[in-house]
C-alpha cells in the first residue's frame, strides 16, 4: 500500500494504515510461520521490501519508512533464526507496472497545500511515470522463484529497472550529499 503526500501533513490514521500493512503485515506473517519452521529446523522467509526501503523517496516517506522497517526487522530476524537453519531474504523491487500506481492513496491536504502542492504534484507525476513504465511483474516473480529454488540465496535481491538497481546499489559508496542531490534532481525538488 502506498500513501502519497508530505510527511508533515500525513494523518496518524494514514501512517498507521501504511505501517500496519507494509511492516506489521510482514511481522505477523513471520510470527505465524516461524514456530513450525523452528520445529522443522529449516525454512526460508522471503520478505518484500523496496528500493524505497534503501533510500527515502520524497512524498512517499511513510512508504519508505515502512520498507526501512522491513529491512531492519529482516536483518535482525536473519541473525535470530540462523541457529534453526532458517534463511531470511529480502527482495527490494524497483518500479513495476502493476496496479500500485492507480491504488495509491493521495493526500488531498498535500495536493492543495500552498507550500508543498506544486512540488508534490511534479514529484508524483515522475513517480507515476516511472511506475507505469516499470518492469513487467514477471521479472519480479522470476527473481523470487530463484530465491525459492536456491539452497543459499543472497540475503538481499534488488530487482527492477537497471538504472534504479544501480542507483540503489551506489548508496553504499556515494556520499549522502550526492545521493540527496541526485534524488532532488530526479524528483524535481528545487
Language-model segment annotations:
Residues 6-7, 11-16:
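Substrate-binding pocket helix/loop in short-chain dehydrogenase/reductase
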Residues 7-8, 55-61:
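Active-site loop immediately N-terminal to the catalytic Tyr-X3-Lys motif
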Residues 30, 66:
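Active-site helix of classical SDR
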Residues 32-41:
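A short helix-coil junction within the Rossmann-fold of NAD(P)-dependent oxidoreductases
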Residues 50:
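Residue(s) in the substrate-gating loop at a strand-loop-helix junction
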Residues 55, 76-87:
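Active-site-adjacent segment of SDR/Rossmann-fold oxidoreductases
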Residues 82-131:
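C-terminal beta-strand-loop-alpha-helix "lid" module of Rossmann-like NAD(P)-dependent dehydrogenases
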